[in-house]
Each structure stands twice: as structure tokens, then as C-alpha cells.
Amino acid sequence: MGASVKPAARRNARQFALQAIYSWQITKENIATVEEQFLSGGKYDEEEHHAAEPALAMPETDVAYFRDLLTGVALSHMELDSKLRPFVSRPMQDLDLMELALLRLAMYEMTRREDVPYKVVINEAIELAKVFAAEDSHKFVNGVLDKAAPHVRKK
């Protein structure tokens, strides 16, 4: 199954999962509610949030992978944080929420999705950081994941 999925479909799933995880961290809504918002086109209550662009409307998105990443990170975020903590140079609560979402997403893929090579996980996280995080966040994300990879994944 994994071999037949196009890389672009996985890339889109990661992008939307990152955005959903970030939203979940900010709003503290039930993860099922966040998932539904993304699956239904990203519509938010406009009185409380800005209208979002339709999330999973892109034709090439691996929706099953999106769901796995989103729910997996939400259900295991404390465990993921404890795996990340030794490799992060500052307290976890001081991380930018986008950096935290990126690191959690990548750590989930490294520890739970062994069908995805760790180098792909790191590269995808770097590319997402370049698009969604602060200017030099991709360097920080790369450093953390490079240090963590040998400890959480057999090369």
C-alpha cells in the first residue's frame, strides 16, 4: 500500500497534518473537531477564527496518512515530547508552536512510521519549516532531528 502512494500525496498530507496540529495546539479543541474542520474544507467559525483556505480539497492528498499523523501526534504528544526533550536546547514550553508542531510530527513519523525513511522525514520537516515556520527555524528543526534520528531509528 505505501509503495503505491505518490510522494506528492504524502507531502500534502504532512502539510495539512502540520497545519491541523498547529491549530489543535492553539485552540486546544478536541482532535476530532480539528480533523473534521480540515476534512470538511477547513471552514472555521468566522467570529472566532479567520476563514481558512480549503485544506484537503487538493486532489492529491493521502487522507488516511493525514488522519494517522494528526491523531497519532495528538494521542502521543507527551511521549513524543519526552523523546524530543534530550535533543532540544531550550525548554519545550519555550518553543514556537509551529516548531513544536513540526518536531512532534517528525518524531511521530520517525518512531511510528518505519515505512518512511528517516532521511525523508527530516527533509520533509525542513521543507515544511521553510514554508510555515520562522526564518531560520529549518536549521533548528534539522539540528534537533539529526541528533534524534540515531537514537529513535535504526539507520
UniProtKB/Swiss-Prot annotation:
| BP-aspect Gene Ontology terms | DNA-templated transcription termination; transcription antitermination
Q: Which GO terms describe its molecular function?
A: RNA binding
Q: Is Disulfide bond among this UniProt entry's keywords?
A: no
Write down any Gene Ontology CC term: cytosol
**Keyword check for Transcription regulation:** yes
Q: Which UniProt keywords apply?
A: RNA-binding, Transcription, Transcription antitermination, Transcription regulation
A Pfam family it matches: NusB
Give the InterPro entries listed for this entry: NusB-like_sf (IPR035926), NusB_fam (IPR011605), NusB_RsmB_TIM44 (IPR006027)
Please give the superkingdom of this protein's source.
Bacteria
Q: Which SUPFAM superfamilies match?
A: NusB-like
The entry's family comment says: Belongs to the NusB family.
Under HAMAP family, the record lists: NusB
| PANTHER family named in the record | ANTITERMINATION NUSB DOMAIN-CONTAINING PROTEIN, N UTILIZATION SUBSTANCE PROTEIN B-RELATED
Q: What does this protein do?
A: Involved in transcription antitermination. Required for transcription of ribosomal RNA (rRNA) genes. Binds specifically to the boxA antiterminator sequence of the ribosomal RNA (rrn) operons.
Kindly provide the name given to this protein in its UniProt entry: Transcription antitermination protein NusB
| Species | Vibrio atlanticus (strain LGP32)
Q: Which gene encodes it?
A: nusB
